[in-house]
Amino acid sequence: MSTEPTNQDQAPIDEALTQEVAQDEASLMDELTQANFRVEELEQLLAESQAALAERKDVEMRAAAETQNIRTRAAKDVEQARKFALEKFANELLPVIDNMERALQGTNPEDEATKAIYEGVELTMKGFLTSVEKFGVKQVNPQGETFNPDHHQAIGMQPSPDFPANTVMMVMQKGYLLNDRLLRPAMVMVSQGGPSVDIEA
């Protein structure tokens, strides 16, 4: 009796192996399909996470830029407030300076009776102007300068052979700047130039 399997005995084994391979193949296909679905889910989650991260980075960058802008604006506002905090106070001092100038104009420095008063007012005024200049207040005396409507207020215009047209020929009241910003315009008389020459005459 031979121990070799016959074709009849081999057929059920082959069939069982074929079924087992088919089942394994089907199981592998199911696992592969599930793995593909899981990969797609993970890819979608990764894309969503990357988009959320990009959005957060954008929001963070915008917030940082806005914070920097606020800091810059705040520093500028503080600097402006510091520079011009004295504006109201400086405006209150201008009439005092004007009165000292009028006192000097109304006093004769050659008259022995008023010479001491003149010198006292003159020294006081020089000291006062030096003090206010330390805080950014500067006097504008545009005598002989070209008229500038940003810093001068014209009281009137007159013909003058001594001054070219559009030149400040007389300062009625000096102007003032506070840190290069106009505090009060200078009140001026502006020249229209010399008299016109009649060509036909």
UniProtKB/Swiss-Prot annotation:
The keyword rRNA-binding appears for this protein: no
PROSITE patterns per the UniProt record, alphabetical: GRPE
GO CC terms: cytosol
Keywords for the protein's UniProt record, in alphabetical order: Chaperone, Cytoplasm, Stress response
Pfam families for this protein: GrpE (PF01025)
Subcellular location: Cytoplasm
MF-aspect GO terms: adenyl-nucleotide exchange factor activity; protein homodimerization activity; protein-folding chaperone binding; unfolded protein binding
UniProt GO BP: protein folding
Entries under InterPro entries matching the protein: GrpE (IPR000740), GrpE_coiled_coil (IPR013805), GrpE_head (IPR009012)
NCBIfam families, per database record: PRK14139.1, PRK14140.1, PRK14150.1
Function: Participates actively in the response to hyperosmotic and heat shock by preventing the aggregation of stress-denatured proteins, in association with DnaK and GrpE. It is the nucleotide exchange factor for DnaK and may function as a thermosensor. Unfolded proteins bind initially to DnaJ; upon interaction with the DnaJ-bound protein, DnaK hydrolyzes its bound ATP, resulting in the formation of a stable complex. GrpE releases ADP from DnaK; ATP binding to DnaK triggers the release of the substrate protein, thus completing the reaction cycle.
Family to which the UniProt record says this protein belongs: Belongs to the GrpE family.
Subunit structure: Homodimer.
Name used for this protein in its record: Protein GrpE
Species name: Shewanella denitrificans (strain OS217 / ATCC BAA-1090 / DSM 15013)
